[in-house]
Amino acid sequence: MDKVKSNKVGLFLVGSRKSGTTSLANFLGSHNEISLCNIKEPNYLNNSLLKSIDSYHSLFDWNKNIQLDASTGYTSDLNNTKNICQAIHTYNSKAKIVYTIRDPLDRIRSHYRMSYERGDLNTSLNEALQSHKLLLDCSRYYSQINVFIHTFGKENVLILKSEELNKLETVKSIIVFLNLSHPFEKQIGLDNAADTDYRMPKSMDKFLTNKFYTIIKFMFPKSIVSFIKSNYYTAINKGLSMKLNIESKEVLKKELIPEMYELQNIVDFDISKWTEKLKLL
């Protein structure tokens, strides 16, 4: 990126949910030229609780060349993507955009599973697809990405395949895209693209994410901490249904296959397997 400081956040990781964005953000933030926002997903340009530009800017280290806002909430609502994109452009017309994509069906299932585990959803996947539009919207990659390409130019939008984040070619493309002066010192560790088969009670979820637990967990061996966590998870044999019915399959094919065809025209890697997988539903 341009080495002249603009005093504006210049890098936005906007999507897609459950496609390795957390891992990628942490990886990018490990580079000494990049400052990752102090809080996860500030969503400042999307009706954030951060009321002023000063409060937003206070979340970054301005001694570094690049400030990174990793907020997948910017692309959660397809109807609002144009507004968010324009808001980013109005804030910084020279911003660079990074967008990770994943097998759309795997992403939907992973997104649904996460929502179920958190207690946000208590219905089957079929019912969730009807009532929670964002499950499908977040897999409409072309419709989302094309807005950013149209606004910022293709040269300022980097599209990455989550399955290939650990590849040397991917890391090289990031270095070139951001015009970094030296390579990264670590690899990308994929975390949030992984799925689990357990559901945690809300009470335990709150405990395991509060500051007290964060402090005391370092007082015990990792084996004990893992044992405690695993014993508070409940296997989700009941309630969680991942099987798609005929209606859901037809909706997914109708909505996502055209997206994949259009997407193939703007990415530099093969996604034909994703398209074929949708056709076989």
Q: Predicted segments — roles?
A:
Residues G20-T21, Y56, L68, I88, ...:
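Generic structural signal for small/hydrophobic residues in well-ordered secondary structure
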Residues Y91-S110:
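Conserved phosphate-donor/acceptor-positioning beta-strand/loop module used by diverse small-molecule
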Residues S71-S76, N126-L136, K243-E250:
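Surface-exposed cleft-lining segments at the edges of enzyme active sites
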Residues S52, Y56, I84, Y141-I145, ...:
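Alpha-helical packing segments of well-folded alpha/beta enzyme cores
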Residues M1-D77, Y91, A95, S115-D120, ...:
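PAPS-dependent sulfotransferase catalytic core
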Residues T22-S23, T75-L78, L105-S110, N166-V171, ...:
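Short catalytic/ligand-binding loop motif for oxyanion handling, primarily in non-cytosolic enzymes
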Residues I39, S71-G73, R102, S162-E163, ...:
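Histidine-centered beta-alpha loop that forms part of the nucleotide-sugar donor binding/catalytic region
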Residues N146-E250, K254, F269-L281:
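The conserved 3'-phosphoadenosine-5'-phosphosulfate
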